[in-house]
Amino acid sequence: IGITGLNPHCESVLKINEDEKYVSEAIKSLIKKKINVKGPFPADTIFLKKNRKKYNLVIGMYHDQVLTPIKTLFEYDAINITIGLPFIRVSPDHGPNESMLGKNKSNHSSLLNAIKFLDF
């Protein structure tokens, strides 16, 4: 598992750095529980080809940090999983696109992948 930092380059000019204070501490806690996790990594480089081969899962801190590169790389095959909720939340990796409503032109791959994921 690769985890992105909160700040774009995992650094800050301030004395308090959220990536060091919170994200790194959370990663250390997961490592103590024997979870194979590394980070925090800059969100602008975690999805480079050499890094994609290292991780089966990337956890980002917010929407655009992960969904923009995932949609660029995998187009309609990706799904969105939200963690930290009291229930499982999985969705297709695209918005509703109301301009296509009723035209039977939507690509349904992401929806099918989300349903298949839930059928584990």
Which residues fall in each region the model found?
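Glycine-rich phosphate/nucleotide-binding loop
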Residues: 26-120
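Glycine-rich phosphate/diphosphate-binding loop of Rossmann-like nucleotide-binding domains
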Residues: 1-40
